[in-house]
From Swiss-Prot:
The gene is gcvPA. The keyword Oxidoreductase applies. Belongs to the GcvP family. N-terminal subunit subfamily. This is Probable glycine dehydrogenase (decarboxylating) subunit 1. PANTHER family: GLYCINE CLEAVAGE SYSTEM P-PROTEIN, GLYCINE DEHYDROGENASE (DECARBOXYLATING). Its EC number is 1.4.4.2. The lineage of its organism: Bacteria, Pseudomonadati, Pseudomonadota, Alphaproteobacteria, Rhodospirillales. Gene3D superfamilies: Aspartate Aminotransferase, domain 1, Type I PLP-dependent aspartate aminotransferase-like (Major domain). The glycine cleavage system is composed of four proteins: P, T, L and H. In this organism, the P 'protein' is a heterodimer of two subunits. One of its GO terms (molecular function) is glycine dehydrogenase (decarboxylating) activity. NCBIfam families: PRK00451.1. The glycine cleavage system catalyzes the degradation of glycine. The P protein binds the alpha-amino group of glycine through its pyridoxal phosphate cofactor; CO(2) is released and the remaining methylamine moiety is then transferred to the lipoamide cofactor of the H protein.
């Protein structure tokens, strides 16, 4: 046991204080044969920083990264351009923490950006109120289902076949331990499902993703009316938040709760997180909304100020009264989202969405001309589903050998599910060039030849 700042006298004083003769006495319950009493034979010497950097850089060079090769990956995580000013602002010492302001009124800057974040989210989703962010879209969806059960006092959730399977698994895990019924529909690559017959008097909510995992935008108006007629709530899930710059916001189609994955704005792709969840709802439901709500007020002198209006989480109130155990959430990612959205503005956000759609239309038209390839979508935003003449996974692997990230095989998202082996999800964003598209089209032609 070596702790370098301690002298031998310090160690003896500590041992005397706790009443043991030596360090070995602390480990008397550990068999002698299991104790390490000498250096392990055969271990290489440690490396210096330069050597470690060289070793790890060599390992990393074996990877194909979305920024270094033509990439058409999507399925819930998208590569978009993030202005350098976003990261530069995040480096400010006042912001470089995602930790909850336990004395919130002292941190007026933090509360102000959270208020602006909420305003942006409410505007793009077409809703009346939004919270100060969630961990990500998947956990936000699970929280939305729990919120619906509290509001309706029912325990059945219907999940669309177009909902991302990872979101579905998070919802099933969360609701399963509470004894709720989760009616998850089969994957729906052709947008043919009819959810209306599934909505009954026991249904708390229906969860629909738009655009769906397979790229189909959904008109939610009829489904929203059917849900409301049965006393159920409609939860809309958006995994590509840029689509809200072009498509009708779910709130304007009657959705009661809107959950989005906000990674596309301000947050680059990364290996496993963090992301940022957006959560918006109707004002009449605000007291059952999870997380925190930042509000604007005036102080005793009439000056504008910001406060945490609602914090109905178990760290602040009695556990049995809490609507969520959401903790530090994704504050820094929410700030990145806020800065990027402020830089874009409403017109810039819409222009970004139109550019994404135009890129995807161009790519889909070119891929549809490849012999044996079929585009399954009549309409889409920046992602669509291809049906290939052979299983998609080996095709994607062959294209990766050509340094092209062609997309996500649907079979990877639904392992063991029959009938999906030849389907491939392809996404195009503003980062994709004509040369990228040329590489994919020509590469696919060669692999399928």
């Amino acid at each position: 046991m070596r702790y370098l700042p301690l002298t031998e006298a310090d160690r003896q004083a500590m041992l005397a204080r706790i009443g043991v003769p030596d360090v070995d006495a602390l480990f008397r319950d550990v068999p002698q044969a299991a104790r390490l009493t000498a250096p392990i034979d055969g271990l290489p010497l440690h490396m210096g920083e330069l050597e470690v950097d060289r070793l790890l850089s060599g390992m990393a060079a074996k990877n194909l990264t979305a920024g270094s090769v033509p990439s058409f990956l999507g399925a819930g995580a998208y590569r978009h351009h993030v202005p350098a000013s976003v990261d530069q602002m995040l480096l400010r010492g006042e912001f470089l923490t995602s930790y909850t302001p336990y004395q919130p009124e002292v941190a007026q800057g933090t509360l102000q950006y959270l208020f602006e974040f909420q305003t942006q989210v409410a505007e793009i989703t077409g809703m009346e109120v939004a919270n100060a962010s969630m961990y990500d879209g998947a956990t936000g969806t699970a929280e939305a289902v729990l919120m619906a059960t509290r509001l309706t006092r029912r325990s059945k959730a219907v999940l669309s076949g177009g909902l991302h399977p990872h979101y579905r698994e998070v919802v099933a895990t969360t609701c399963g331990v509470l004894g709720m019924e989760v009616a998850a529909q089969a994957p729906d690559p052709t947008d043919a499902e009819d959810l209306l017959p599934l909505v009954d008097d026991a249904t708390a909510c229906v969860v629909v993703q738009t655009p769906s995992l397979f790229g189909h935008p959904r008109d939610l108006s009829e489904l929203a009316a059917a849900c409301h007629a049965k006393g159920a709530l409609l939860i809309a899930v958006v995994t590509e938040v840029v689509s809200l710059g072009l498509l009708t916001p779910p709130g304007r189609m009657g959705a009661d709760i809107v959950v989005c994955e906000g990674q596309s704005i301000g947050n680059p792709l990364n290996f496993g997180g963090p992301h940022v969840g957006l959560f918006a709802t109707r004002e009449k439901f605000v007291r059952q909304m999870p997380g925190r709500l930042c509000g604007q007020t005036a102080d005793a002198e009439g000056k504008r100020g910001f406060v945490l209006t609602l914090s109905t989480r178990e760290q602040h109130i009695r556990r049995e009264k809490a609507t969520s155990n959401i903790c530090t959430n994704s504050g820094l990612c929410a700030l990145a989202f806020t800065i990027h959205m402020a830089l874009l503005g409403g017109e810039g956000f819409a222009r970004l969405a139109r550019l994404n759609h135009a890129k995807a239309v161009t790519l889909a038209d070119r891929l549809a001309a490849v012999p044996g390839v079929e585009v399954l979508n009549g309409a889409f935003f920046n992602e669509f589903t291809l049906r290939l003449p052979r299983p998609a996974a080996p095709v994607v692997e062959a294209l990766a050998q050509r340094r092209i990230l062609a997309g996500v095989p649907v079979s990877r998202l639904y392992p063991g599910e029959a009938g999906l082996e030849t389907l491939l999800l392809v996404a195009a964003t503003e980062t994709n060039t004509e040369a990228d598209m040329d590489a994919l089209v020509h590469g696919l032609q060669e692999v399928l030849r």
